[in-house]
Amino acid sequence: MLEFIENNESTIRVGFFLGILMLMWLWETLSPRRTLSVSRLFRWINNLGLVVLNTILLRIIFPAAAVGMAVMAQQNGWGLVSILDWNPLLIIIFSIIVLDFMIWLQHVAVHAIPAFWRLHRVHHADRDYDTTTGLRFHPLEILLSMVIKFIVIIALGPPVVAVILFEVILNGMAMFNHGNVRLPLPLDKVLRILFVTPDMHRVHHSVEDDEANSNFGFNLSIWDRLFGTYVDQPRAGHDAMTIGINGFEEKNEVNRIDGMLLLPFKAKMNGYVINRRSWK
């Protein structure tokens, strides 16, 4: 099974991506959580167009990507995992958990460091919130994220299959927890004990400073609970809360691909970054 995953990485990743995207589209159509303010077709064309651009850019600059770095680390015996005499399955689980924590930490960093926040604003400027929001990131942030991932992989030395599984899980969970979908509240309450749910992560996309700087997790909810950044519900409620960034309301700027590409270079920094915000 592990060998099959390694040998069919691209097929597995593309298959899961398209499958989950279509499932989320169907779920959002049948059971939406909120009424969207912008045409879904317009947003999907532009958000997914940005995904295509990012994919091409990554293939040009980092053709081997994270999996290639994991292969190199394994071949050269780099990282913590190389000195651990553990069961292979335990090492895979451990590696996925460590990678998830590092993604959480990276997410905190892009809110805390002004230059990084400029890039991350593209993700938060979406005035609606659906599964494609979880995929829209500025190309420079995608490249930054890959460099950070390389450093983590070199230090950790995770099995190749762990990196593949993590990438599939991260992509799928990002689409799930950004979904404009309605979960039964009892189910949401149980799921978010361990995992990030759409209602939990939606709080993070609030225009309110303290809410936007909470719930940083993409996969596991435990990091926000452990480090005191967990917020249960938005003050205004999910139906009435405002999503996006104050000062970024113009449709073409926040929803059209050319506007998204230019957005980091527009406007002065405001008080929205963690280390410059005013708490309420």
Residue ranges and their predicted role:
Residues 12-22:
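Structural signature of hydrophobic alpha-helical transmembrane segments
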Residues 12-13, 38-52:
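Loop-to-helix transition at the N-terminal end of transmembrane alpha-helices
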Residues 25-44:
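Membrane-interface helix-loop junction between the first two transmembrane segments
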Residues 52-65, 80-81, 86-240:
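Membrane-embedded catalytic scaffold of the fatty acid hydroxylase/desaturase
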Residues 63-74:
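Membrane-helix interface motif
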